[in-house]
């Protein structure tokens, strides 16, 4: 990037209802997703020769909440470097000064699909356990830095056709050391842990509940706790898992406890009935063993009382998962979060704006000095060409046939379905 920005470095293109003003190195923009946090386009990076995802943060300075989320996401993405966490490749703004500053663009790896597009596939145990292993590795890496994701759901987990998986979207991630009372509307309702629903606060294994919900959804092909609202979500949980013990009730605030204790009592359904043998792969005796292990893992993750729920470390060592265990992945050095006050910070919008601007300028300065001129090892295959289109919106070619890819063979056919090969 040149020492001073010029209009010639950027060009504008209309994407849905938004205008993307991006560096000219990013061509062939195509919208692939949108949400409260921003709009995402697939693009081809003519400098690195790879397909990337360009995310434009939606009105990051419209209020303090949006501004804080934007700052948090940017800081965390800059700090985290793990093969199961999405990699940040570039950050830029087309504006030249703090006074003009209003747009933030994040450039990240482009994957083939998110888990929403995988839910209805018939996954064998090998692929399912490997996807879960990677999910847990990514979560453990975040937890090792005191970061709780808080918003794990199928749309925030992306995969490639070689069965690699990455976690994305850190707008809601929060450091664990912060003293706070949780708002119940942190996580998408279906994946929200009981302690969040009941306003108990949380610890790291709040993310394990979400993983359990996602695993259950992968097994059954549908959302397992599909509440219509906040209260109904709790009802759906206890209808299946049973009314919690008196010991758990004592941990609740009096008003919440009064409500919970006055709900109809449910004995709960056995996990053998919630997740019967026939919904798992059962082609061999080995599959039957794996089915028993998978169900056992679900029963340990989907526990209402967080004090009795399995931890990330325990999940990684569970028989269903541990076959994949690699210390380099599961015990990677924790990321160093350079802003120790990441959560305690409270600022006016203009102050948040200045902090974010400094982060963007810091990235651009480091890029000029060659610190960030290449993607990390986790980036997508550099063999992509402009003519290769990501299959992120076309998963019709997904294969459920068991084909193993070499650990070292990262080359991908762009027409291949997201889970065509698993290591």
From Swiss-Prot:
SMART domains: S_TKc (SM00220). The gene is Mapk9. ATP binds at residues 32-40, 55. The modification Phosphotyrosine is found at residue 185. The TXY motif contains the threonine and tyrosine residues whose phosphorylation activates the MAP kinases. Interacts with MECOM. Binds to at least four scaffolding proteins, MAPK8IP1/JIP-1, MAPK8IP2/JIP-2, MAPK8IP3/JIP-3/JSAP1 and SPAG9/MAPK8IP4/JIP-4. These proteins also bind other components of the JNK signaling pathway. Interacts with NFATC4. Interacts with ATF7; the interaction does not phosphorylate ATF7 but acts as a docking site for ATF7-associated partners such as JUN. Interacts with BCL10. Interacts with CTNNB1 and GSK3B. Interacts with DCLK2. Interacts with MAPKBP1. Interacts with POU5F1; phosphorylates POU5F1 at 'Ser-347'. The keyword Cytoplasm applies. GO terms for biological process: apoptotic signaling pathway; cellular hyperosmotic response; cellular response to amyloid-beta; cellular response to growth factor stimulus; cellular response to interleukin-1; cellular response to lipopolysaccharide; cellular response to reactive oxygen species; cellular response to tumor necrosis factor. It comes from Rattus norvegicus. Disulfide bonds: none annotated. The active site is at 151 (proton acceptor). Its EC number is 2.7.11.24. Activated by threonine and tyrosine phosphorylation by either of two dual specificity kinases, MAP2K4 and MAP2K7. Inhibited by dual specificity phosphatases, such as DUSP1. It is an enzyme of class 2 (transferase). It catalyses: L-seryl-[protein] + ATP = O-phospho-L-seryl-[protein] + ADP + H(+); L-threonyl-[protein] + ATP = O-phospho-L-threonyl-[protein] + ADP + H(+). Belongs to the protein kinase superfamily. CMGC Ser/Thr protein kinase family. MAP kinase subfamily. It is found in: Cytoplasm; Nucleus. This is Mitogen-activated protein kinase 9. GO terms for molecular function: ATP binding; JUN kinase activity; mitogen-activated protein kinase kinase kinase binding; protein kinase activity; protein serine kinase activity; protein serine/threonine kinase activity; protein serine/threonine/tyrosine kinase activity. Residues 366-423 are annotated as: Disordered. Residues 26-321 form the Protein kinase domain. The lineage of its organism: Eukaryota, Metazoa, Chordata, Craniata, Vertebrata. Dually phosphorylated on Thr-183 and Tyr-185 by MAP2K7 and MAP2K4, which activates the enzyme. Autophosphorylated in vitro.
């Amino acid at each position: 990037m040149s020492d001073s920005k010029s209009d010639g470095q950027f060009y504008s293109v209309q994407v849905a209802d938004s205008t993307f003003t991006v560096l000219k190195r990013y061509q062939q923009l195509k919208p692939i997703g949108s949400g409260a946090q921003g709009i995402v386009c697939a693009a081809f990076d003519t400098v690195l020769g790879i397909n990337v995802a360009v995310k434009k943060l939606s009105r990051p300075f419209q209020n303090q909440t949006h501004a804080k989320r934007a700052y948090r996401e940017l800081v965390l993405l800059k700090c985290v470097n793990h093969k199961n966490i999405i990699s940040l490749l570039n950050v830029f703004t087309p504006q030249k000064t703090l006074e003009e500053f209003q747009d933030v663009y994040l450039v990240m790896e482009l994957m083939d699909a998110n888990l929403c597009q995988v839910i209805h596939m018939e996954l064998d145990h090998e692929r399912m356990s490997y996807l879960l292993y990677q999910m847990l590795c990514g979560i453990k890496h975040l937890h090792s830095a005191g970061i709780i994701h808080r918003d794990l759901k199928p749309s925030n987990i992306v995969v490639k056709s070689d069965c690699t998986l990455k976690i994305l979207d850190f707008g809601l991630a929060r450091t664990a050391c912060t003293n706070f009372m949780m708002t119940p509307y942190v996580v998408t309702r279906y994946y929200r842990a009981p302690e969040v629903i009941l306003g108990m606060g949380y610890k790291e294994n709040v993310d394990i509940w979400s993983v359990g919900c996602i695993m259950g959804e992968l097994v059954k092909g549908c959302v397992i706790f599909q509440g219509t609202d906040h209260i109904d979500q709790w009802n759906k949980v206890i209808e299946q898992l049973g009314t919690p013990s008196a010991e758990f009730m004592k941990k609740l605030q009096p008003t919440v406890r009064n409500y919970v204790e006055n709900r109809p009592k449910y004995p709960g359904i056995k996990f053998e009935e919630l997740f019967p043998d026939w919904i798992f792969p059962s082609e061999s005796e080995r599959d039957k063993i794996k089915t028993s292990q998978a169900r056992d893992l679900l029963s340990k993750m989907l526990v209402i009382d967080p004090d009795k729920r399995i931890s990330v470390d325990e999940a990684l060592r569970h028989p269903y998962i541990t076959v994949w265990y690699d210390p380099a992945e599961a015990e990677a050095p924790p990321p160093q979060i350079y802003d120790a006050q990441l959560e305690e910070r409270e600022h006016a919008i203009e102050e948040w704006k200045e902090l974010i601007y400094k982060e963007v300028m810091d990235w651009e300065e480091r890029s000029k000095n060659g610190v960030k001129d290449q993607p990390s090892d986790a980036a997508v295959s550099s063999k992509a060409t402009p003519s290769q289109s990501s299959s992120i919106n076309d998963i019709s070619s997904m294969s459920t046939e068991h084909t193993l890819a070499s650990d070292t063979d990262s080359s991908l056919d762009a027409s291949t379905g997201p889970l065509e090969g698993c290591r």
